[in-house]
Amino acid sequence: MTKVTYTDAAKKHAVREFLFSYFKFNAIVGLAGPNINEYIQWCKSKGYEDIEVWENTPDVLMNQLLTLQHPIKMKFGNILDAEDAKPNTVYDLDYCSTVYTLEDHITKFKNNFIMTFSLRAGIQFTIKEFFKTRKEKIIKSIVKNSPINHTIFTTNQGKYIFTPYCDTSAMCCIAKIK
């Protein structure tokens, strides 16, 4: 089932609010999801002035362009073609696929990102494959239950936050925060 909106996804919204609190930039590059105007309004409410949205499905892009109510940078193509190291930019990569189908995406983006994955492959497999693909070793992990359930992973190359959640299906976000 393809979602047409995330307005009723309370857990997704809580995770998004929590993770984006770690990024204080004015630019965002992302995948807008099913409702581009909802996404842009949310970005603007968080202070993002420079918004670049990528879409690689022609029908979805056409629908987004027909309903678009805000001036933004709209790119047709694979987000792998996006510049991956823009200064003062967060990358919002809401893939909704399993980790093992996104190896190129996981290795491309180095810093300041939030990646959303399906947990169909399981939590442990997702975590293990993510860091294996990035060629990083987990040095320390700290589990916290507040303000939402999350794990802070410190690796040999940085710091990440992992947040599992479930609205209609089991999902997770992994954010590179340092």
Residue ranges and their predicted role:
Residues 92:
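A conserved beta-strand element that flanks and buttresses the S-adenosyl-L-methionine
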Residues 3-6, 124-134:
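Short, flexible/disordered intra-domain loops and linkers
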Residues 1-46, 54-88:
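S-adenosyl-L-methionine
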Residues 111-125:
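Conserved beta-strand signature within the Rossmann-like core of class I S-adenosyl-L-methionine
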Residues 128-178:
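Class I S-adenosyl-L-methionine
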Residues 97-111:
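A short, conserved alpha-helix within the catalytic core of class I
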Residues 17, 36-44, 62-67, 84-86, ...:
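A short acidic (Asp/Glu
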